[in-house]
Amino acid sequence: MTPEELIGQWQQGLGNSHRAHYEAAKYYERLHLWFGVPTVVMSALLGTTVFTSLQHADVAWVKTLMVVLSVSMIALTSLQTFFKYSERAERHKTAAVQIGEVRHELEQKLQFGPVDEAFAKAIREKWDAADRQAPTFPPGLYERVETLRRNPLQKPSGGGA
């Protein structure tokens, strides 16, 4: 493999990783909302239902609704706390920024000067450092980003991220 081919592979890899981390951040932000919004709505409904049940203590469906809302709210809150979707989203955003900086540095060098061995080593070390701190992608996400890079007109598949 020639140095030019290696740098070309690095450009593709950095581009894929950069985009995949942003896509992962969006994915985890959506999950955070999917769990968070229903929890807030259920909390409001539960609060309203408590006041209603005080007035209609003998109505069975009100008591059943309170139990269902309480259990659902506890389950969603627990899942949201356990999976830490907002934290995961933030970690992917940070990784995307770090990898983007490495990518932009490489692209700038390719435009304005030759890439020598010392520069290539420095880029590889920066990329390795960013990868060590980066979280893993959701299953199949990187492959979808790679497919989109090869076929830009293809729509992304709906599953996962």
Predicted regions and their residues:
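Conserved non-transmembrane functional hotspots
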Residues: 1-41, 52, 62, 76-161
